[in-house]
Amino acid sequence: MLDPALLRAGRIDRQILVDRPDRKGRQAILKVHLQKITVEPGLNGERIADITTGFTGADLANLVNEAAIVATRRGAVAVSLDDFTAAVERIVAGVERKSSVLRPEERQVVAYHEMGHALAASSLPAMDPVHKVSIVPRAIGSLGYTLQRPTEDHFLISCQMLKDRIVVLMAGRAAEYLAYGQISTGAADDLARATDIARQFITRFGMSPVLGQSVLERQSATYLGERMQGVGEKDYSEQTAREVDIGIRALIEEAYGRAKALLESRRADLDAGARLLLERETLTPEEFPALLPLKPVAVFTQVTETSP
């Protein structure tokens, strides 16, 4: 953070924001870091860039080191694409904690929860394809996770896509309710993320039918002395704040209702998928083609986790 006084005219006139690299930028960064390790013939930065959408330069450097460690642990001389894929998963979802043993009834709840996320994501056409579903606990504190991959970089997100993302997040809790008639604390992280999307939907993107097309909260700034989100007074009245809260609840309840209706229509798939997940613990698209319509798979972006 810089003091705003330093940014007055005549002091620092040029401000450059270094954003996350696009596909071509990732290739250039990877070209530098791949020189430090031995990779399998035919493997290059272009293929790895396809599985690293959203990664920063530091993330890519860490990825190369992590992939080399994965290859070393399996006794390989050269690093393969599978090693990079495993490294991405470790970075995004954390290290597996197979020593953590859940009670049978808890494993069942987690299995239904994660299969709910997976089925919702696969049923909504605008959502990123499901890459992996697992009920193996991870070091980051999750009891299970669902990984999704986009097919390309996204620069614009529609109103419907935001609503569908909330549906996918709420589908874990909806699956628990359909299977057991009650909900658990496993959706805590999902609720936090759904609330964040709903708040931005209303206050940043001007998509609320009630509050209209106005920006109530600025995007949080992380460079050159601009104010950070949450610092300072609110830009709107208490009445507007109440309307924002009502709008957030309405969006989440609407998404929860859609998630329940969707999973009810695919109840047989939900039950079959949960049973298969309990049996194998981790599923890839190749292992459940009858359950999840396959979509082109490219990179990790979203991890939907079950909290303790």
Spans of features found by a protein language model:
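Short regulatory helix/loop adjacent to the ATP-binding pocket of P-loop NTPases
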Residues: 1-11
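Conserved C-terminal "switch" segment of AAA+ ATPases
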Residues: 4-5, 18-85, 90, 94-95, ...
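Structured loop/turn residues at beta-strand edges in well-structured enzyme cores
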Residues: 10, 43, 128
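Non-catalytic interfacial helical region
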Residues: 13-16
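P-loop NTPase motor-domain active sites and their immediate coupling elements
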Residues: 50, 98, 270-273
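Short hydrophobic/aromatic residue motifs in ordered secondary structure
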Residues: 59, 116-117
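Short pre-active-site segment immediately N-terminal to the catalytic Zn-binding motif
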Residues: 99-109
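Soluble catalytic regions of large protease machineries
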Residues: 107-112, 118-308
